[in-house]
Every structure is written in C-alpha cells, then in structure tokens.
Amino acid sequence: MASSAEAAETREAFRESVRAFVEREVLPQAEDLDRHGVFPERLFKRLGQLGYFGLRYPEAVGGQGADFTTACVFYDELAAGSLSLAAIAAMQSLMGTHFVFRFGTDEQRERYLRPALRGEKVATFALTEPGAGSDLGAMRTRARRTPNGWRITGEKTWITNAPVADFLTVGARTSDEPGLASIALFLVDASTPGYTVGRPIEKLGTRSSLTSEIHLDCEVPADALLGGEGEGVKNVGGLLSEIRVMTAALALGLSRRALNDSARYASERQAFGKPIGEHQQITAKLAEMATDYHHARVATYDAAERIDRLAQRSDSGENVTAVASMVKLFATEACARIVDEATRIYGSYGFAMEYPVQRYFRDARFLLSGGGTSELLRNLVGGTVLKRGGV
C-alpha cells in the first residue's frame, strides 16, 4: 500500500492530467453545450475512453481500481470546465452503474457495466417520482411477479440522462406494504417494450445534462432484481454518503472557476482610474469567496478520505453519514454564495449572456437539490446532533 505522501503525489499528478484535459477539450465547448442544450456525445465517449467512468471500479470489470478521494479529484476538476458534463459523468460512474456492479449477474456486467465504463452505453438511475422526491416512502411505482419475471408499472421524473440512456436502475415496490420496506431495485433495458421516455424538462442550468420523465409498463426477467426484495432503500442508503461528498466535489470545481474568473476580471476591469480589485469592497468580496472555498475544499476531501478509510475498515464509519451531509450542505451553499458574489463583481456584465459567470450562477442551483436539499440535510444533521447530545 502506498504511503500517504505517495498517494497525495499520485493524486496531484492525476489532477493535473484531468485539468489539462478539461482545458484542452471541455472548456472550448462548454458555452455552446449550455446554449444549445445538447448531450455532449463526443466528450462522453472520450471520458469513457480515458477510463474516467471506471475510476472506482476494480480492474476485473474494466475499471481503474482508484479510491474515492481520487474520484472526487476527477469530479472537482471536470466541474470546473462544465457542470453539465460533470453531472452526466457522476451519474454514469456512480449511481447509474453501481448497483449493476454490486448485484448484477456476470452476464449483466458484461452486457451493461463494461460498455458503460468504456463510454459505449449510457446509464441512469430512477427513484424520483412526481409525488415522491426525498420522501421515498411515497413511491408508487409497482413491480409485480409474473411467470417470467416482473412487470413494472409507474412513472419517474427528474431522471438525468434519461433521453439518451441505454439502461437504468429503477426503484419500485414489490408489495402494497406502505413505507420503505417494500422498495426494491430493478435493471431495465431502455429497449424493453413498454419503457418510454416522457416529457423533457427544460432547466435553468446544467442544460446539456438532459433530464426527463420516464414511463414504465414493461416486463423484465427475474434476474433484473438487483439486491433482495425490500432492500432497495438500504442499498441506496449505503451509497448516499458518496453521492453527497461527490456533489460537494462538483461544487468545489464550479466555485473555483467562478472565483478565479472573478479575480482575473477584477484585475483587468478599470473603475475610477484603477483596477476594481483595488477597491476595498471588491477585495472584501474576493476574501469571503476564497474563505468559503477553502473551508469547503478542506471539508470535502476530509470526508472523502473518511469514506476511503471506512472502505479499508480502518474507520468505524460512525460519523461518515453525518459528515457527508454537513459537507454537501456547506460546499453547495458556499458555491451558491461564491457564484452570486461573482455576478456582483462583474457588475452589469454579470447579467449578460456573453460572460460565462451567468452559467455558473444558473448551474449552481442544481447542486442545492441534487443529493438532498439543504432543508433535508439540515434536518438530518440537526437530528444527529440532538441524538448525540452535541458534536
């Protein structure tokens, strides 16, 4: 096992390679992708070819065998180029493929997981319903046994990648028992008769990360059940800490881009005979932005390392869930503050479509709800503090 210093050095070299890719191939396209709201097919395939989708998966299934902290470096750097592309990559490399890896058959891994990691198939994950977002207990999608497997009926909404997905993991009830105990996960091929993509959702930000409703009235084979009946919420819950820290890493990349652009603009823009960055009000804004970013960065990578220690069984995991929630809450709200201040530093141009700062402002709103809303996370963290009698 590499020493901490060696691991850090390897990670920084990886960061530089991702950053170079982003500067060379992502940034030149970011504005057009946002403006036209199209799926970035060429860049998606490039991410697969470069092995980025398989970072967290073992080499035995076509992955790279990297740790979670390294994956967060990837999400962080990619989001600095395009949060839309980073959101697509997060779905592909984490939620969309995780359950096929953990619970799929060898045949399913060959048919779905390996091509997805290579960027040849698009994956997604479908839990949210029109009447059930964070409240999974209100889920209505139903899976009923048939002689050949399962019949799934229902609808989902806010499904990332759905318009272009080749397969998806779907949450559905296997009985009429209310609450969380009857929810299970199923693998659905997008070519299955009775599976249809519904209304596209026109979004404020992350516009090239295509999102839509889906409708299910389809039959899937018996082995489409991923994990046991009634174990869906438990299995999703096991991934939530990674999802939340990953979302915080996305916020870091967007925050850094907005902060660096603002510092550059403040050095170049003149007002009253000197760069606006030399005026105290602008200096104060940059100081607050940098402080927010620094705190978010330290907390995010600390949480990522905790998850890695838990995976190595060198951490009890007692605080990982709460810490992941706190980090997601702080980093995404810090990002929202940073991009808001960035638009103010740009003055009237912060309201103009010709500068990318307006895209940062719009994209940041996605981070506030993905992985759990700020309101939900405050309830979770506050409840944990009360339960423990403090911190």
Located regions from the model:
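Structural signature of FAD isoalloxazine-binding scaffolds in flavoprotein oxidoreductases
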Residues: 65-75, 135-139, 218-221
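Alpha-helical interface subdomain recognition
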Residues: 1-85, 91, 103-108, 115, ...
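Short glycine/proline-enriched turns and hinge-like loops at secondary-structure junctions
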Residues: 66-67, 135-137, 161-166, 179-182, ...
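Short Gly/Pro-enriched turn/cap motifs at secondary-structure boundaries
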Residues: 89, 116, 131-134, 158-161, ...
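A short, charged helix-loop
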Residues: 212-238
